[in-house]
Amino acid sequence: MQSIPIKNVGESRLVDPFQRQYYYLRLSITDQCNFRCTYCLPDGYQPEANKPSFLTLKEITHLAQAFAEMGTEKIRLTGGEPTLRKDFISIAESITNIDGIRQLAVTTNGYRMAKDVADWKQAGITSINVSVDSLDPKMFHQITGINKFDDVMRGIDRAFEVGYNKVKVNSVLMKNLNDKEFEQFLAWVKDRPIQMRFIELMQTGEMDSFFDKFHLSGQVLADKLLKNGWTLQHKSHTDGPAKVFTHSDYTGEIGLIMPYEKNFCASCNRLRVSAKGKLHLCLFGEEGIELRDLLQSHEQQGILQARIFAALQGKREHHYLHIGDTGVRNHLASIGG
């Protein structure tokens, strides 16, 4: 475990040595997932024996309060599949009630969405990202290992019914698997308020051969969009890494997440905390800085904030994916991708 010196940061905001400000926390609340996606957990979730349990509701609340006081405005609940937690609604309600948190998002596989999305809305979830890697039910099954395409589609429709104005849909771009569906995805968002986001396949320790076989640059899609009249939009300070394109003939939008692009890290605005309480400065970075020992009481909050601030001063200017350095992560489910 990396040790971090303690000092009093007072009212310091989350700013790194490169003057990037961090308004956005991606908080994993479980490693567990009920899908077996080929690019993430192809063998399914494998619980680790004798490992610490996931953060409790109380610990999550202390953590979110500390980040909010340091300037965090947006928290995204991730996993694993975050909605598998029995106290998911309680977690959402607790974070919603914290001063300074303006947006509470969730990334989900959509498995429980049709049944539960009204409760998510009531609990304060302001935006939803759903994973849909194919619009072909057979290909969806092949990629996810689960035959639940129709359920996920019903969940997206239900989200609009209960009052969400937009749903973001994530698709991991894979050569010769779903890249041929680009036109189909465009047609799908033509009259729907969906931001369809294509995420470049990312290399991790366990997936080198899979990456070599299926990686496709998102620039291929960017070139198609620009050629066909789509316009790149400006980001707000709490937006994620996607480049978002709009077109006057389309209700929906297209987002591209291209981590291998030059200067991808220049606009980084997010930090990550794992389901077991480690702070990660980068998706492709270090083993993590322990925070859980300082999540046991409100009286520890000043020391907790000092540790977070000190850790941030060691954040690198950029990742090293371009030279094959994927960090220590075997797969991305462990810190919420």
UniProtKB/Swiss-Prot annotation:
Binding site for GTP: 26, 76, 107, 168, 270-272
Residues binding [4Fe-4S] cluster 1: 33, 37, 40
Keyword Transcription: no
Top-level taxon in the UniProt lineage: Bacteria
Single GO BP term: Mo-molybdopterin cofactor biosynthetic process
Co-factor: note: Binds 2 [4Fe-4S] clusters. Binds 1 [4Fe-4S] cluster coordinated with 3 cysteines and an exchangeable S-adenosyl-L-methionine and 1 [4Fe-4S] cluster coordinated with 3 cysteines and the GTP-derived substrate.
Positions annotated to bind S-adenosyl-L-methionine: 39, 80, 131, 202
Annotated positions binding [4Fe-4S] cluster 2: 265, 268, 282
Cofactor annotation: [4Fe-4S] cluster
Pathway(s) of this molecule: Cofactor biosynthesis; molybdopterin biosynthesis
Domain Radical SAM core residue range list: 17-243
Enzyme class: lyase
Gene Ontology MF: a single term: cyclic pyranopterin monophosphate synthase activity
Keywords, alphabetical: 4Fe-4S, GTP-binding, Iron, Iron-sulfur, Lyase, Metal-binding, Molybdenum cofactor biosynthesis, Nucleotide-binding, S-adenosyl-L-methionine
Known catalytic reactions: GTP + AH2 + S-adenosyl-L-methionine = (8S)-3',8-cyclo-7,8-dihydroguanosine 5'-triphosphate + 5'-deoxyadenosine + L-methionine + A + H(+)
The EC number(s) this enzyme carries: 4.1.99.22
Stored PANTHER family: GTP 3',8-CYCLASE, MOLYBDOPTERIN COFACTOR SYNTHESIS PROTEIN A
Assembly notes: Monomer and homodimer.
General function of this protein: Catalyzes the cyclization of GTP to (8S)-3',8-cyclo-7,8-dihydroguanosine 5'-triphosphate.
Family stated for the protein in its record: Belongs to the radical SAM superfamily. MoaA family.
Name of the protein in question: GTP 3',8-cyclase
Organism: Haemophilus influenzae (strain PittGG)
Originating gene: moaA
